[in-house]
């Protein structure tokens, strides 16, 4: 039997903050399993989960509104530590007898709080000291409402001039509230506070580590599928690659990977995937060359959303056909990760407006009665990468920049043609190669080239040429929700432009995209 890595667990109730997933990732980084649930859970669900502690997230609502979200009352009766963050602190204060008022001024940004009373949450944690020796903490505030009276059995732990109750605590019940965000890096000691709560106050052991996660996943896969055969769509992306390696470790040759080469991949990507997984790691791979089929389906289509749907539909068709050729396959594996599960769950915190449709395997083949294997569904992307390293996958492959599911289908603007894809592949490879050579690749969050269906006059030797235009795009971001364009050196951009125009016959002009997100999106389509 493998160790129970879910034995100690934290429940995070989501009130809608943009930082809630970051809270969960921080808890996981501390080696402790946690799950993220909507705030309106039932007492029975909490009892069934049996958490070692509960965190109440921040949120955009006002606790002073009549129908604003509230924590289930059982949260405060379960006998486990509770940590309220921002809105989570406000609803805790209000529900336990304190008072919250709407503030005329939003407090947003850096603040320094002074610790005025001892608490297990911040004992020995400080960024600086006042003249009379009291600890100061540098924190990140983001709130409109504020607590104006704490519950009678709480004490004030820290305050600022504008926020008299920046930290409150009931040490006996192990209830804590902070009016700032410990999960963001701007709160310099935030990770230590979370560690103090999770590891010391909740007494959770660090059982959630890459090696133990792998052992647990392998055991669970074997228990789920036994000696049955499993099929997986392998794209060469991080999620499907790590899924393939976990399944291979668990069931060996009973796994068949289907690699669909849609003609929309990066330069030499198909060969690299086949070499690494087939030749090097010894996985059983079915290679399906399907470039003509995808490009035929895309012919004449200019609309980005329609292109995405065509690519998704054709992939499912091709995958289904290959699956039907295999005998006795009982299970379909997918690289679903935890954020996919969170996004697809019906959450009372509301849904973001759909900007672009997400590309994924469209479901099980209709003719096949297969079960679903999702070994990554509890993991965040950063955890998937760490597991990939532990399984022996190369760093460069696991940490390369994001690549959209539809591939070059949404990086060739307008109609997708083989000629355009071939030009774009070579131009993009030059851009990425130069970024690596200049030690800039890991300094930007994402970089790629876009093919513009526009011809431009150029000069080559004594002649004029009338060829295509490409745009370089590089951004810096923490969460991909917002992004700044990367200020790459002019001489570097000039070098990339010269190489592309001289080495890629058919491109006459290179431009650089200096749009931020918002108002632009990172991808052009």
From Swiss-Prot:
Keyword Transferase: no
Annotated catalysed reactions: XMP + L-glutamine + ATP + H2O = GMP + L-glutamate + AMP + diphosphate + 2 H(+)
Record: active site: 86 (nucleophile), 181, 183
Domain Glutamine amidotransferase type-1 span(s) in chain numbering: 9-207
InterPro entries: Class_I_gatase-like, GATASE, GMP_synth_C, GMP_synth_GATase, GMP_synthase, GMPS_ATP_PPase_dom, NAD/GMP_synthase, Rossmann-like_a/b/a_fold
Domain of life the protein comes from: Bacteria
Ligand binding (ATP): 235-241
Gene Ontology terms, MF aspect: ATP binding; GMP synthase activity
Protein purpose: Catalyzes the synthesis of GMP from XMP.
Quaternary structure note: Homodimer.
Record protein name field: GMP synthase [glutamine-hydrolyzing]
Organism: Escherichia coli O127:H6 (strain E2348/69 / EPEC)
UniProt gene name: guaA
């Amino acid at each position: 039997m493998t160790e129970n890595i879910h034995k100690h667990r934290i429940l995070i109730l989501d009130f809608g903050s943009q930082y809630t997933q970051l809270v969960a990732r921080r808890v996981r980084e501390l080696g402790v399993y946690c799950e993220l649930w909507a705030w309106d859970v039932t007492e029975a669900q909490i009892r069934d989960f049996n958490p070692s502690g509960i965190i109440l997230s921040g949120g955009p609502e006002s606790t002073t509104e009549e129908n604003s979200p509230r924590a289930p009352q059982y949260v405060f009766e379960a006998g486990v530590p509770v940590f309220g963050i921002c809105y989570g602190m406000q609803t805790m204060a209000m529900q336990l007898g304190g008072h919250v008022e709407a503030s005329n001024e939003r407090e947003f940004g850096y603040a320094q709080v002074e610790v005025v009373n001892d608490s297990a949450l911040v004992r020995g944690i400080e960024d600086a000291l006042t003249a009379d020796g009291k600890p100061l903490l540098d924190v990140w505030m983001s709130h409109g409402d504020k607590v104006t009276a704490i519950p009678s059995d709480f004490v004030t732990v820290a305050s600022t001039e504008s926020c008299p109750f920046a930290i409150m605590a009931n040490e006996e019940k192990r209830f804590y509230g902070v009016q700032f965000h410990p999960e963001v890096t701007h709160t310099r000691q935030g990770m230590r506070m979370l560690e103090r709560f999770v590891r010391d106050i909740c007494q959770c052991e660090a059982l959630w580590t890459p090696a133990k996660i792998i052992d647990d996943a392998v055991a669970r896969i074997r228990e789920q599928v036994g000696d049955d055969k499993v099929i997986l769509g392998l794209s060469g992306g991080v999620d499907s690659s790590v899924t393939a390696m976990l399944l291979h470790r668990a069931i060996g040759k009973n796994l068949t990977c289907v690699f669909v080469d849609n003609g929309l991949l990066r330069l030499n990507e198909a060969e690299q995937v086949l070499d690494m997984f087939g030749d090097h790691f010894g996985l059983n791979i079915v290679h399906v060359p399907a470039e003509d089929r995808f490009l035929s389906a895309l012919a004449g289509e200019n609309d980005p959303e329609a292109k995405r749907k065509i690519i998704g539909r054709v992939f499912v068709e091709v995958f289904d056909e290959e699956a039907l050729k295999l005998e006795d396959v009982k299970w379909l594996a997918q690289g679903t990760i935890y954020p996919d599960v969170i996004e697809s769950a019906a959450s009372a915190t509301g849904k973001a407006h759909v900007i672009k449709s997400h590309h994924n395997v469209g479901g099980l083949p209709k003719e096949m009665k297969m079960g679903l294997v999702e070994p990554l569904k509890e993991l965040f992307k950063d955890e998937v990468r760490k597991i990939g390293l532990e399984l022996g996958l190369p760093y460069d492959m696991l940490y390369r920049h994001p690549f959209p599911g539809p591939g070059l289908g949404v990086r060739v603007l307008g109609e997708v043609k083989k000629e355009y894809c071939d030009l774009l592949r070579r131009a993009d490879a030059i851009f990425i190669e130069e970024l690596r050579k200049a030690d800039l690749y890991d300094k930007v969050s994402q970089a790629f080239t876009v093919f513009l269906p526009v011809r431009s006059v150029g000069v080559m030797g004594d002649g004029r040429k009338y060829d295509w235009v490409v745009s370089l795009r590089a951004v810096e971001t923490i969460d991909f929700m917002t992004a700044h364009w990367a200020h790459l050196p002019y001489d570097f951009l000039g070098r990339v432009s010269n190489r592309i125009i001289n080495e890629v016959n058919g491109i006459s002009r290179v431009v650089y995209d200096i749009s931020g997100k918002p108002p632009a999106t990172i991808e052009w389509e």
